[in-house]
Amino acid sequence: MLLPALRAVQDACIPHAVFTHTFRGYINGLHRLGAGTVSRLYGYHVTTIWDSADLNIVATLPRLDPASRRPQPDNLRWVGPIIAAPARPQREDPPLVLVSMSTNGFRGQRRTVERTINALATLPLRAIVTTAGVLNPDDLPKALNVDVVGYVDHGELMPRCSLVVGHGGHSSSFRALAHDLPLLVIPASPLSDQRMIGASIAAARAGLSLRRSASTETIRRAITTLLTTPQYRSAATQIGAEVRASDATGQAARLITGLT
């Protein structure tokens, strides 16, 4: 957030831009009530500082961001998610499911991953679970059709996948959508942007969102529904086309150079 630096830049009347890496609806809502409350104790009002910048670049799709349906400051520009260009899809049969939860190790994350593995174990598919060092793969349940690993390049896996099960992080969720993949979102933290992202994806019919406490059977039913109902893939494909066409980095660069 660099609030002291932004305050100093504004006091010096130096042209500057701020970057919103997730939904504006979250930054101006729940985040303002969480981290924003702490910032106010030090005399920094996040919304005021953000809205006073010459430019606020929001790196997400406006139609999924709840804030796009409300009036916004004149400095705000949506450019789309900044995502590396996806490789050509090579879907596997039986379908391959990628499970990727947060790298922050939120409370209860192990139980969510365990229930997800148990849900996948009885389905006619293959799955790869990446733990990113947060959990030890050897400590998780074993299943013949599920590989549990530490680190794997998701950019290599996603073209082969038919579904992603994740925690609702903005980057990983939109990376999946850029590959035309529907999502099962199981938010790891009620204070993060994850619930809002999961709800928006579900509302767009590009996936489903469950509570962190969802049972193994509930997760199993959701995975089955997403793999067997074409409308979810269709909606994800439409969003994926929008992400790939957005030229987010180019738009952001042109906006920034326009400040000079």
Regions inferred by a protein language model and the residue ranges of each:
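C-terminal amphipathic helix plus adjacent low-complexity
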Residues: 12, 217-260
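Short beta->alpha connector loops at strand-helix junctions that form conserved
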Residues: 20-21, 168, 185-189, 209-213
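Nucleotide-activated donor-binding/catalytic signature segment of Leloir-type glycosyltransferases, i.e.
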Residues: 124, 134-152
